[in-house]
């Protein structure tokens, strides 16, 4: 109900101005204006919206809040536009103004959404000069080359993908960046190991199959730890790689390509799109980052290292903490690369991406790192006045014992194996249910449903949690058909598809929607919250808000369908209720798609 909320806010401001012209004029002079403090009603019995402006006005106006509220209501009642939207306002408690939207307005909103593929969600507007919206960068996933993706990459990948989907749906040009770890000293040992175990690949191959990358990495690391000569050669390889030695670059490229192929298999399964732009992309910009910081007067030499001391951030000794951008040996580090990336992403094309909002989706353990480099980038003047740098932190994935999720052997859980198990468990549950129901389905149906449900369960279990907190991973909970789970939401969509199979025309049109039952109005009001929820997710970057909404919508729909006849109802109620079924299905499908979850017609 965003459009109604905007109209009501405007009408409330005008009513307050008319009721208290002197206070309104004074507020305008101060550059603020009097805020009607309009918000969705906290409980259904309070109507649809609640305006709380009377309470903060009591002290400056030296009047009781209820008296102020009454004066505002008097002005609202002479506004024909307001009266066309709302019933007579109710003053509650110390001075809250409760607003209830007229039933015919709610019905008209439902009618409009039935004809709108965007379900009332507006596209973001461009700049005032008519330009298109500026790009938003979402930096997520970001695995390391020569290491297999593990459960720790799950959260960044699917949270980042969901946020990118919401931003894209709102109309923002989104640059989905995969800042893979494709550079660094570890490549010295990896290249040395590759040259020794597969030297022929460096002469002839455009691709190399190193088998299990995790095993390959461990072998290289073991040799590096145990063999002094291997260590020496590895360090020499780092120098060669940084110097552009063709053979070292070929080995590096082969390692990157194999990792890239393995990563893509995961991304394809999860239906995640990414543009790879690894750490190595910024190598050419690192020296100029240090030069810029020096010119701006931020750079300080400390024990041979070049660093920027942070403002307002001190260590245990009370001294400002540094962000090191060049080590004493002349080398660069993660902070240098991240600063180069920030500068590039905000720089105007063709020198950069021209973004005005850059979002980093990483684990909460990197919060201090990003706070530091964000401050440095701001002080260096690389962030435009309207630019927004945002870190989207998330907690750990834990086992049901509350500890970091591990295999029985104590190893990190590989993401590929976790997804495999989710699908296998979903298939087992499905086969058991089919047997109990006496249903005979072909193998292609079983494979499709198991794959969809298994992957959806993993995604939704993660996204439905507040990302800031740790969450406990449980296959049993996430695959349950009851509760706030993907199977529960998918089943609501399937249930509506079943109505159509039983002869209910979900595309039926009716000249005027009419509702009379409490359950109908509850569903109407829940459906009309969708646009506000999307706007909230876009701003606060919390996908769990969308999950909570979709779960509550499914609950309201199930109560409606269980308590009110649909197919057996008389006209015009039958058509009106079928319209609500269709809008519910459309809303669930669109909402789930923004979470990266496809739906099913049958389960």
Curated annotation (Swiss-Prot):
CDD domains: Anticodon_Ia_Arg (cd07956), ArgRS_core (cd00671). A motif ('HIGH' region) lies at residues 143-153. InterPro entries: aa-tRNA-synth_I_CS, Arg-tRNA-ligase, Arg-tRNA-synth_N, Arg-tRNA-synth_N_sf, ArgRS_core, DALR_anticod-bd, Rossmann-like_a/b/a_fold, tRNAsynth_Ia_anticodon-bd. Its EC number is 6.1.1.19. PANTHER family: ARGININE--TRNA LIGASE, CYTOPLASMIC (PTHR11956:SF5), ARGINYL-TRNA SYNTHETASE (PTHR11956). Belongs to the class-I aminoacyl-tRNA synthetase family. This is Arginine--tRNA ligase. It comes from Prochlorococcus marinus (strain MIT 9303). The lineage of its organism: Bacteria, Bacillati, Cyanobacteriota, Cyanophyceae, Synechococcales.
């Amino acid at each position: 109900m965003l459009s109604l909320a905007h109209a009501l806010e405007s009408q409330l401001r005008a009513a307050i101005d008319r009721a208290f012209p002197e206070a309104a004029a004074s507020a305008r002079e101060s550059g603020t204006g009097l805020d009607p403090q309009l918000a969705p009603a906290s409980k259904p019995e309070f109507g649809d919206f609640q305006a709380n402006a009377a309470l903060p006005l009591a002290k400056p106006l030296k009047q009781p809040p209820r008296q102020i509220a009454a004066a505002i209501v008097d002005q609202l009642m002479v506004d024909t536009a307001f009266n066309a939207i709302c019933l007579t306002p109710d003053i509650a408690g110390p001075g809250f103004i409760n607003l209830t939207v007229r039933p015919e307005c709610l019905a008209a909103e439902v009618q409009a959404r039935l004809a709108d593929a965007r379900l009332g969600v507006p596209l973001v507007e461009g700049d005032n000069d008519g330009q298109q919206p500026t790009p938003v960068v979402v930096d997520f996933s970001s695995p390391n080359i020569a290491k297999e993706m593990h459960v720790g990459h799950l959260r960044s990948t699917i949270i980042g993908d969901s946020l990118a989907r919401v931003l894209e749906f709102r109309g923002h040009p989104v640059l989905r960046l995969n800042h893979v770890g494709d550079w660094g000293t570890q490549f010295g040992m990896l290249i040395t190991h590759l040259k020794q175990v597969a030297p022929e690949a460096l002469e002839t191959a455009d691709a190399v199959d190193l088998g299990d990358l995790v095993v390959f990495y461990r072998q290289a690391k073991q040799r590096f730890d145990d063999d002094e000569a291997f260590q020496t050669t590895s360090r020499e390889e780092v120098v060669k790689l940084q110097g552009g030695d063709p053979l070292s670059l070929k080995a590096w490229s082969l390692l990157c390509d194999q990792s890239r192929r393995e990563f893509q298999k995961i991304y394809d399964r999860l239906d995640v799109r990414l543009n790879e732009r690894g750490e190595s992309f910024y190598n050419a910009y690192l020296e100029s980052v240090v030069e810029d910081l020096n010119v701006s007067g931020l750079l300080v030499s400390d024990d041979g290292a070049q660093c920027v001391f942070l403002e307002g951030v001190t260590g245990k000794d009370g001294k400002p903490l540094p962000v090191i951008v060049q080590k004493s040996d002349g080398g660069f580090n993660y902070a240098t690369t991240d600063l180069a990336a920030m500068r590039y992403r905000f720089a105007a094309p063709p020198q950069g991406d021209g973004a005005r909002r850059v979002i980093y989706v990483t684990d909460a353990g990197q919060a201090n790192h990003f706070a530091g480099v964000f401050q440095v980038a701001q002080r260096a003047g690389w962030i435009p006045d309207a630019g927004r740098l945002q870190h989207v932190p998330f907690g750990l994935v834990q086992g049901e014992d509350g500890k970091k999720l591990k295999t029985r052997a104590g190893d990190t859980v590989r993401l590929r194996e976790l997804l495999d198990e989710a699908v296998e468990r979903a298939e087992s549950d499905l086969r058991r249910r089919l047997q109990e129901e006496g249903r005979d389905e072909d193998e292609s149906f079983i494979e499709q449903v198991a794959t969809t449900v298994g992957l959806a369960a993993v995604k939704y279990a993660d996204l439905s949690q507040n990302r800031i907190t740790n969450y406990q991973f449980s296959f049993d909970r996430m695959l349950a058909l009851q509760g706030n789970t993907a199977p529960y939401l998918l089943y609501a969509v399937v249930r509506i598809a079943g109505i159509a199979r039983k002869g209910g025309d979900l595309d039926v049109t009716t000249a005027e929607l009419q509702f009379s039952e409490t359950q109908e109005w509850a569903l109407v009001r829940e459906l009309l919250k969708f646009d506000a929820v999307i706007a909230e997710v876009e701003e606060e970057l919390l996908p769990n808000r969308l999950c909570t909404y979709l779960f509550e919508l499914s609950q309201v729909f199930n109560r409606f369908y269980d308590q009110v006849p649909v197919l057996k109802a008389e006209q015009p109620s039958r058509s009106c209720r079928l319209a609500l079924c269709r809008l519910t299905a459309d809303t669930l499908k669109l909402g789930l798609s923004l979470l990266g979850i496809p739906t099913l017609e049958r389960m």
